[in-house]
Swiss-Prot record:
Signal peptide: none annotated. Belongs to the hemerythrin family. Pfam families: Hemerythrin (PF01814). Keywords: Iron, Metal-binding, Oxygen transport, Transport. Fe cation 1 binds at H26, H55, E59, D107. Coiled coil: none annotated. It comes from Golfingia vulgaris. This is Hemerythrin subunit 2. One of its GO terms (molecular function) is iron ion binding.
Length: 114
């Protein structure tokens, strides 16, 4: 069972990783998915894809620089999300659920390690 999806769908302190750049990027991803839920336009999807790619790259560089042991697992999770965005079928509920659970399970594993 996953974590509850916030309503309204906004970042809150329970998602804090304690790396300001990552927390700020997570806020941007929440915002992007929120907007996509209200307007499933190609422009909103493209903006979410752009922000997601930038965030994943930044996170992966931090993990590589610190030789984080969970790097490969983390990249696989990122690749799966990107694949879903690149083959988008309008499932905003899935995207909301993925981000919440990714942060609170996968991202929380690197707290204090990168």
């Amino acid at each position: 069972m996953g974590f509850p999806i916030p309503d309204p769908y906004v970042w809150d302190p329970s998602f804090r990783i304690f790396y300001s750049i990552i927390d700020d990027e997570h806020k941007t991803l929440f915002n992007g998915i929120f907007h996509l839920g209200h307007d499933d336009s190609a422009d909103n999807l493209a903006e979410l894809r752009r922000c997601t790619g930038k965030h994943f790259l930044n996170e992966q560089v931090l993990m590589q620089d610190s030789q984080y042991a969970g790097y490969a697992e983390h990249v696989r999770a990122h690749d799966g999300f990107i694949h879903q965005l690149d083959n988008w079928h309008g499932d905003v509920k899935w995207a909301k659920n993925w981000l919440v659970n990714h942060i609170k399970t996968i991202d929380f594993k690197y707290k204090g390690k990168i």
